[in-house]
């Protein structure tokens, strides 16, 4: 019997970008794994990196060929692309791309991100002047010829999670309003991971709030009726995913270090809200935001037993050393409420940013 040998040829079209073409993001890559030769490997030496707002950080990423110490074959240009994964993992946001001498950064990362390039196989990304929104997971992708591989690095920020509801009261925010409410208070909407870490650190809160992935949850360390249910285990209770337009809950916000001074303004008299705003301005500052009082309390140990106005019209005071008449049972940012702004009953907390 005559044996027939069929040879199937697969043709791959490859177009090198024109040297003057800076639109690197539009280049179409066809990914095919070569059967022969060393395989391209991309490695992140650390899966998690910790930093804080205003700092600089390096997200590690290196690439190798399996069973060799070489960085590349030398026959193809190497393309490095960094993207940020959204909290629901449904999208990737472009951060930075490099190929040859071409470099391009995107959106709010422009002017703040660079490749470290400490060696020929170093694709690590440097992020400067870290913002709250930089928190999250980043993907490093390296492409050489027909090969590609990826690694994921998580950027975590030191900070504090706090529950927030507006003057209108409990359960009055849809998802988009919740996002804006956090931004207005010098913070961002918290992720599940951030809320989980806050719960592990003792956060106990009985009102459900939005998280960045669109879920609604709340942390319970001391289960009770009607907070998590009597005779149940502690944990982060999950209400699931709700309509982002019509469903209304509170929100959990996250903030980190600030570049400035938070302080209680010494003033001869108590102030109305409008007088409080003007008093801070006269002192070369602005009335402080809720995120700033939580950051000062949690990260700097700020302690003051005087209730003061904040920018959202609420009145609060931070206690890091519990004592008689000053939050005797626990360290906390105490919430007085949203009093009538014409009441001349409180002081004010101010914030002066450093240039």
Swiss-Prot record:
InterPro entries from the UniProt entry: C-type_lectin-like/link_sf, CTDL_fold, Hyaluronan_bind_Proteoglycan, Ig-like_dom, Ig-like_dom_sf, Ig-like_fold, Ig_sub, Ig_V-set
Glycosylation: residue positions: 21, 56
Primary subcellular site in the record, as a coarse category: secreted
Keywords: Disulfide bond, Extracellular matrix, Glycoprotein, Hyaluronic acid, Immunoglobulin domain, Repeat, Secreted
Record's GO cellular component terms: extracellular space; perineuronal net; synapse
Protein's name in the database: Hyaluronan and proteoglycan link protein 1
Domain Ig-like V-type, first and last residues per copy: 38-156
A GO term for molecular function: hyaluronic acid binding
Domain of life (superkingdom): Eukaryota
Gene: HAPLN1
Chain segments annotated as transmembrane: none
UniProt record similarity statement: Belongs to the HAPLN family.
């Amino acid at each position: 019997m005559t044996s027939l040998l069929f040879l199937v040829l697969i043709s791959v079209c490859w177009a090198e970008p024109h040297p003057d073409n800076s639109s690197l993001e539009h280049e179409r890559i066809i990914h095919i794994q070569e059967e022969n030769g060393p395989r391209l490997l991309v490695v992140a030496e650390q899966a998690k990196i910790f930093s804080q707002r205003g700092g600089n950080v390096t997200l590690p990423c290196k690439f190798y060929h399996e069973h060799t110490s070489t960085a590349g074959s030398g026959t193809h240009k190497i393309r490095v692309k960094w993207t940020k994964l959204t909290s629901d993992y449904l999208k990737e946001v472009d951060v930075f791309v490099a190929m040859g001498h071409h470099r391009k950064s995107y959106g709010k990362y422009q002017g703040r991100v660079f490749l470290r390039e400490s060696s020929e196989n170093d694709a690590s990304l440097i992020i400067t002047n870290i913002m709250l929104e930089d928190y999250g997971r980043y993907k490093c992708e390296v492409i050489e010829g027909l090969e590609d591989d990826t690694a994921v690095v998580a950027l975590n920020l030191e900070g504090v999670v706090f529950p927030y509801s507006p003057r209108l009261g409990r359960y009055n925010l849809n998802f988009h309003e919740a996002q804006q409410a956090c931004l207005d208070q010098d913070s961002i909407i918290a992720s599940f991971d951030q809320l989980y870490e806050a719960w592990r650190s003792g956060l106990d809160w009985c009102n459900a709030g939005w998280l960045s992935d669109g879920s609604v949850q709340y942390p319970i360390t001391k289960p009770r009726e009607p907070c998590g249910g009597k005779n149940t285990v502690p944990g982060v209770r999950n209400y699931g995913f709700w309509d982002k337009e019509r469903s209304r809950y509170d929100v959990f916000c996250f903030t980190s270090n600030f570049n400035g001074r938070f302080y209680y303004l010494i003033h001869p008299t108590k102030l109305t809200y409008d007088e409080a705003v003007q008093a801070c301005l006269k002192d070369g500052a602005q009335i402080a935001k809720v995120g700033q009082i939580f950051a000062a309390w949690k990260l700097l140990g700020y302690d003051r037993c005087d209730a003061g106005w904040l920018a959202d019209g609420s009145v609060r005071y931070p206690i890091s050393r519990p004592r008689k008449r000053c939050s005797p049972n626990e360290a906390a940012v105490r919430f007085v409420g949203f009093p009538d702004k014409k009441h001349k009953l409180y002081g004010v907390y101010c914030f002066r940013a450093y240039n």
